[in-house]
């Protein structure tokens, strides 16, 4: 029997900077009202003179994740993204690792992203932020383990 996959079981974790050996702690991304992945394929299109149709091939990806969140105090992930917005950080100061986890299979994909600020304060009831995470590197496939019910995870890359 097929199982409908629920959105809340596809989790995202953000690399909050730390002084540990990895340089970050993968912390669950909570309070997000939007986390939409865009694959943005890079295409090679060619039309040969002896063929009626054009050929299209995907030659790469420029993956991005559009985000939006309600700003909650005392949340490390939200505070870090808000700091990038508010202080207009650039370059490596605005790069973070994001891990996407499928709790149905235990599979995970880790990738570095640049935090691209968009808007802030566009709701009259609560303070909000939105923008995009844009890929800056290849994906690393693997699995995760957790000892705190997915508040944080440890990623192990496939070999």
Please describe what each predicted stretch is.
Residues 143-159:
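Intrinsically disordered, low-complexity terminal/linker regions enriched in Pro/Ser/Gly
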Residues 99-139:
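Short beta-strand and beta-hairpin "edge-sheet" elements
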Residues 77-109:
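Short, acidic/charged, Gly/Pro-enriched secondary-structure junctions
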Residues 79-88, 112-114, 129-130, 147-148:
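"Short basic amphipathic alpha-helical interaction patches in structured regions
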Residues 63-84:
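Ordered, amphipathic secondary-structure segments that act as subunit-interaction surfaces
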Residues 16-19, 70-72, 100-107:
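Short, flexible beta-strand-to-coil junctions
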Residues 30, 70-71, 133-137:
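Secondary-structure transition/turn motif
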Residues 1-68, 115-127:
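Solvent-exposed edge beta-strands and adjacent loop segments
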